[in-house]
């Protein structure tokens, strides 16, 4: 446990940021999973789910939670599976 006041604050803010980052990554993964399931089932709303998933992937990459190449790979897989 840190003794310096600013270090104590950093621990607190890091915990908050970590929780936010984990939540955002989980939301992205869920959106991708729902989109892939909709594509597999050929659901009526698959275009909408793919659009939402791509948006969440872009937001996650923009926040540097995943690498840009990984984001591009996920989006490419969604688009090619949707055809």
From Swiss-Prot:
Domain of life: Bacteria
UniProt GO MF annotations: small ribosomal subunit rRNA binding; structural constituent of ribosome
Classification via Gene3D superfamilies: Ribosomal protein S20
UniProt xrefs under InterPro entries: Ribosomal_bS20, Ribosomal_bS20_sf
Keyword rRNA-binding recorded: yes
Biological process per Gene Ontology, one example term: translation
Keyword Lyase: no
Alphabetized Pfam families for the sequence: Ribosomal_S20p
Annotated GO CC locations: cytosol; small ribosomal subunit
Keywords: Ribonucleoprotein, Ribosomal protein, RNA-binding, rRNA-binding
Family under the similarity heading: Belongs to the bacterial ribosomal protein bS20 family.
UniProt-listed NCBIfam families: S20 (TIGR00029)
Function per UniProt: Binds directly to 16S ribosomal RNA.
Annotated protein name in UniProt: Small ribosomal subunit protein bS20
Gene source species: Staphylococcus carnosus (strain TM300)
Classification of source organism: Bacteria, Bacillati, Bacillota, Bacilli, Bacillales
